[in-house]
């Protein structure tokens, strides 16, 4: 089996709806709980997301072994059974990222989300070379994740896009409005644009005006119907609904999220526990919410489950 999508078809499919970034399940001994992960993917994929990103940031890529990444991707491909594109991660240094991209292709993923290089300083030209090498190592469509040290400006991104037809997307986790505006102004419909800031619902409406038609919804993990409804309001530019839900739920949620570094992932697993779908603890160096914070989150979720 191989990808059912060409790179451009994959990008088009992802841009048409909300994106699912599932957590990775761990047991009490911090081992990857693949049966629980597969069961949760069955549940998640029963909701109409446009694509599923296995072992991404919300899935604690940074805490997984490469073997666990492969297992998570293979499980996602199997459990979704063609209902949506499955996007696999690639990251760290260029050699490892190339190996991960090639493994994703062997595991029948439909595309690659390319994470920033690991623990090194680099300029836009260096990042561009990194992205180009990964793109040329696979036939899958690649979405580059602009975040941390992976800061491509519009000129560098356009150069890579010209050289690599399978570079089909840019995910913005930087939040620089001028940079995003320049990228969209230069590249337009050449790329898919994905909102990737933590709790992306916060920024979904203004980002839509910059050509960003979709985003990674961590909240989808525990409130999929709410997340899909909010996304529909964004695409309809229903300001009244958007700002009601921002004030009543999203912004108070971000207050809890901001209590501690790394809570952007931890709070998602806490949310799953709150709705009766526990996924186990987060792996170190992250920390789980305190019981008091968990109680506050449970109260905030309320009847939205």
Swiss-Prot record:
Q: Which UniProt keywords apply?
A: Lyase
Concerning InterPro entries, the annotation shows: Aldolase_TIM, DapA-like, Dehydro-deoxyglucarate_dehyd
| Family statement drawn from the similarity comment of this UniProt entry | Belongs to the DapA family.
Enumerate the Pfam families for this protein. Answer: DHDPS
* GO BP terms in the entry: D-glucarate catabolic process
What are its E.C. numbers? 4.2.1.41
What protein name applies here? Probable 5-dehydro-4-deoxyglucarate dehydratase
Q: Which reaction does it catalyse?
A: 5-dehydro-4-deoxy-D-glucarate + H(+) = 2,5-dioxopentanoate + CO2 + H2O
Q: Name one GO molecular function term.
A: 4-hydroxy-tetrahydrodipicolinate synthase activity
This protein's source sits in the domain of life called: Bacteria
Q: Do you know which SMART domains this protein is assigned to? A: DHDPS
Q: What is the organism of origin for this protein?
A: Xanthomonas campestris pv. campestris (strain ATCC 33913 / DSM 3586 / NCPPB 528 / LMG 568 / P 25)
Fetch the HAMAP family from UniProt: KDGDH (MF_00694)
Query: What CDD domains does the entry give?
Result: KDGDH
Pathway per the UniProt entry:
Carbohydrate acid metabolism; D-glucarate degradation; 2,5-dioxopentanoate from D-glucarate: step 2/2
């Amino acid at each position: 089996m191989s990808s059912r999508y060409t790179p451009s078809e994959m990008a088009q499919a992802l841009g048409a709806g909300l994106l699912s970034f599932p957590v990775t399940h761990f047991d009490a001994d911090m081992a990857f709980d693949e049966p629980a992960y597969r069961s949760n993917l069955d549940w998640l994929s029963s909701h109409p997301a446009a694509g599923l990103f296995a072992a991404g940031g919300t899935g604690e890529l940074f805490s997984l072994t490469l073997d666990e990444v492969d297992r998570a991707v293979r499980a996602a491909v199997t459990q979704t059974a063609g209902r949506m594109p499955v996007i696999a991660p690639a990251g760290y240094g260029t050699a490892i990222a190339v190996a991960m991209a090639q493994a994703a292709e062997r595991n029948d993923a439909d595309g690659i989300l390319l994470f920033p290089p690991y623990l090194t300083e680099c300029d836009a030209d260096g990042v561009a070379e990194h992205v180009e090498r990964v793109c040329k190592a696979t036939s899958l469509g690649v979405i580059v994740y602009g975040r941390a040290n992976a800061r491509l400006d519009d000129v560098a991104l356009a150069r890579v896009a010209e050289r690599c037809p399978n570079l089909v997307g840019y995910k913005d986790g930087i939040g620089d409005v001028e940079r995003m505006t320049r990228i969209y102004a230069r590249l337009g419909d050449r790329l898919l644009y994905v909102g990737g800031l933590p709790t992306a619902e916060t920024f979904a409406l203004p980002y839509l005006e910059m050509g960003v038609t979709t985003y990674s919804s961590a909240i989808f993990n525990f409130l999929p119907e709410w997340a899909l409804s909010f996304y529909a309001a964004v695409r309809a530019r229903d300001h009244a609904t958007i700002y009601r839900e921002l004030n009543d739920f999203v912004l108070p949620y971000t207050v809890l999220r901001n209590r501690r570094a790394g809570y952007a992932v931890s709070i998602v697993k806490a949310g799953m526990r709150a709705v009766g779908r526990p996924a186990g603890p987060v792996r170190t160096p992250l920390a789980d919410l305190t019981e008091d914070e968990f109680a506050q989150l449970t109260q905030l979720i309320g009847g939205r489950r």
